UniProtKB/Swiss-Prot annotation:
Organism (species): Leptospira biflexa serovar Patoc (strain Patoc 1 / ATCC 23582 / Paris)
PROSITE patterns: RF_PROK_I
Keywords: Cytoplasm, Methylation, Protein biosynthesis
Record flagged with keyword Protein biosynthesis: yes
Protein name from the UniProt record: Peptide chain release factor 1
Single GO molecular function: translation release factor activity, codon specific
Gene3D superfamilies, per the entry: 3.30.160.20, 3.30.70.1660, 6.10.140.1950
SMART domains membership: PCRF
A Pfam family: PCRF
Family stated for the protein in its record: Belongs to the prokaryotic/mitochondrial release factor family.
Taxonomic lineage from the root: Bacteria, Pseudomonadati, Spirochaetota, Spirochaetia, Leptospirales
NCBIfam families linked to this entry: prfA, PRK00591.1
Cited PANTHER family: LD18447P
Chain positions with N5-methylglutamine modification: 230
Length: 353
């Protein structure tokens, strides 16, 4: 481990040096992101190497020390140092796991109503509100890209972006089917209905990551029915883009400007094309699938929200909270932390196997 930690130190210092010399904005951005990623492990590695040297120095002194009090003090110092090294080694094991290739990326979130009719659409709106509140607590900016509303305050679908380097790491375990059990407001008999909503987390893809030919696109413009007042209903500001080779269709209508809506739709298109390629690759990566918390499959039922019992259960890790009202208000830290810890444990076990 010592050699590996020294290499990390060297890499970090090299990045610091390159940052001091860099002038191009893209280079500065990439170097800053890499430094930010390495800083925690560099700090921990520095502490580990320092304590290792202190222990070695104390052992050398112990061999030639005849004074009983000094001998006892050095022995105690070595024991404390070795205990601390054990703790640091466990932390470093986790920190040195291969990073998720999408870590540090902004994301697009798609929430779609599934089975359950109007009740599913209402829960789609509830999930968006929950994520919006959680994002706000974490300082993430939510930007709506497209939405299709139902007549009673729900959504058939809503797509939004979270533009922050913490976004993917916080939301990556939300992909899948979310099931809700509750008595609908429209239900006169008081019967519990079960509905479902699907969530897709799409890491944002940069233009250089996904090549899209203009000739492969069919672009349609139409009058928006979204936010923005009367203006959006009197001009063809909404944009729908079809990627002919894959059949992927994306849309954006939340901006007054057709150009801005086109840019937003292209962001979604790039993310979906990249996601489709990743899903194809994932089918042949069985070992990687087993190392993750759940498969991230859209059809996988990951969580149940039981309103009559005030209970939320994540089926992938057996996590249950009996404080559903707080969760629906965006208090997701305990749940997401549990998912992150379980994922780390599985990846660590896989690395040692």
């Amino acid at each position: 481990m010592i050699d590996r930690l020294k290499k990390i130190q060297e890499k970090y210092l090299r990045i610091e040096d390159e940052l001091a010399k860099a002038t191009a904005s893209d280079t500065l951005k990439n170097l800053s992101k890499e430094r930010s990623r390495l800083t925690p492990v560099y700090t921990k590695a520095d502490e580990y190497l320092k304590i290792t040297k202190d222990c070695q120095d104390a052992k050398s002194l112990l061999e030639s020390e005849n004074d009983p009090d000094m001998h006892s003090m050095l022995k105690s110092e070595i024991e404390e140092g070795e205990k601390k090294l054990e703790e640091l080694a466990k932390e470093l094991e986790i920190m040195l796991l291969p990073p998720d290739p999408n870590s540090g990326k902004s994301i697009l979130v798609e929430i779609r109503a599934g089975t359950g009719g109007e009740e599913s659409g209402l829960f789609c709106a509830d999930l968006f509100r929950m994520y919006n509140k959680y994002a706000d607590k974490k300082g993430l900016r939510v930007e709506i890209i497209d939405m299709s509303q139902t007549g009673i305050g729900g959504y058939k679908e809503i797509v939004f972006s979270l533009d922050d380097d913490k976004a993917y790491d916080l939301f990556k375990f939300e992909s899948g089917t979310h099931r809700v059990q509750r008595i609908p407001e429209t239900e006169s008999g008081g019967r519990i209905h079960t509905s479902a909503v699907t969530v897709a987390i799409l890491p944002e893809a940069e233009e250089k990551e996904v090549e899209i030919k203009e000739s492969d696109l069919r672009i349609d413009v139409y009058r928006s029915s979204g936010a923005g007042g009367q203006h959006v209903n009197t001009t063809d500001s909404a944009v729908r883009i079809t990627h002919i080779p894959t059949g992927i269709v994306v849309a954006s209508q939340e901006e007054r400007s057709q150009i801005k809506n086109r840019d937003k739709a292209m962001r979604v298109l790039r993310a979906r094309i990249a996601d489709q390629a990743a899903e194809t690759a994932k089918l042949s990566a069985d070992a990687l699938k087993k190392a993750q918390v759940g498969s991230g499959d859209r059809s996988e039922r990951i969580r149940t929200y039981n309103f009559p019992q005030g209970r939320c259960t994540d089926h992938r890790i057996g996590f249950t909270s009996h404080n559903l009202p707080a969760i629906m208000e965006g208090d997701l830290d305990e749940l997401i932390d549990a998912l992150i810890q379980e994922d780390r444990s599985k990846r660590l076990a896989e690395a040692k196997a």
